[in-house]
Amino acid sequence: MSDTPQSEPRRSDDRSGADDATAAAAGSTDAAAAAVSSKTGGIAGPPGGPGEVDGDEPAVARTVGESDEQLQDAWTDYEFDGDAKVSVSDLDTYYGEERALESVSLDIPAESVTALIGPSGCGKSTFLRCLNRMNDRIRGARVEGRVALDDRDVYGDGVNLVELRRQVGMVFQEPNPFPKSIRDNISYGPRKHGDLETGLLARLLGRDDRDAERDLVERALRRAALWDEVNDRLGDNALGLSGGQQQRLCIARCLAVDPDVILMDEPASALDPVATAKIEDLIEELAEEYTVVVVTHNMQQAARISDQTAVFLTGGRLAEYDATDAIFQNPQSQRVEDYVAGKFG
């Protein structure tokens, strides 16, 4: 096994990322630490515990002098108040015979932002896609272990994938609005689920209103901080929006089906700094109501927006999971310290 990231596995239907959208719709350590300090008032995280990270696979980057024995145990005993919204136990994921994730276990708290960081090819996007079974769409993908949403195994018998992806929405790296009007982008998901036709939407909104679609569109766009910018051109093609507006539209499209969890795979990596700041502000606002899980290569961004951070290292193993301030100010393994310091990645 080499450190070179594997090529992207092909989807089972060889379709583009737009089809994933359709399915989903139905730094430096100093800068990162500064962001944490600003967010937490300069308070360091909890004192560390025993914790050298796992990862005795040859492909896993390690600090000179660390032995296999020292790399046995990951520091992932992160404790938080309340129940887990998502609970992952002993998760292994394969593409054909190649293992992409190995023995990953962690609990994700509700109404918070969890960041997933690590070098390219470490498995963080694979992990994200396991949470709503988007990996089912990739040829040869196989998942072992347990992923529970509100204590129900999403890989168990009788799981309705359409309903699962409604509960666990996804926003992708590249903005991918449908080539339809802004209005139709928002109403696509509820129409697909039959909400507009059955009156479920009106009940969700707490009102019996014939203008349910209009209310839905406005509500979703307001939640995504986009309404004031587009309310006078809802009939325009969404492809005419700026990149940042398109990404917020995709977030609004996700919100329109009333999810519990929102997955974001590098949602700001293709955007300029101004648009990125708007997305970051939006993520923090969404966490007041939703459980948000974000993959990012930008460690400063992870430090700014997240409550807890999971660090994956090459080989698909979880190296460390803790409160974000602890990860950046007091990491429990040398490898994680080296990674957040930019010594490899």
From Swiss-Prot:
Signal peptide: none annotated. Its EC number is 7.3.2.1. It is found in: Cell membrane. Residues 42-52 have a biased composition (Gly residues). It is a peripheral membrane protein. SUPFAM superfamilies: P-loop containing nucleoside triphosphate hydrolases. SMART domains: AAA (SM00382). The keyword Transport applies. GO terms for molecular function: ATP binding; ATP hydrolysis activity; ATPase-coupled phosphate ion transmembrane transporter activity. Gene3D superfamilies: P-loop containing nucleotide triphosphate hydrolases. Residues 8-18 have a biased composition (Basic and acidic residues). ATP binds at G118, P119, S120, G121, C122, G123, K124, S125. GO terms for biological process: phosphate ion transmembrane transport. The keyword DNA-binding does not apply. Belongs to the ABC transporter superfamily. Phosphate importer (TC 3.A.1.7) family. This is Phosphate import ATP-binding protein PstB 2.
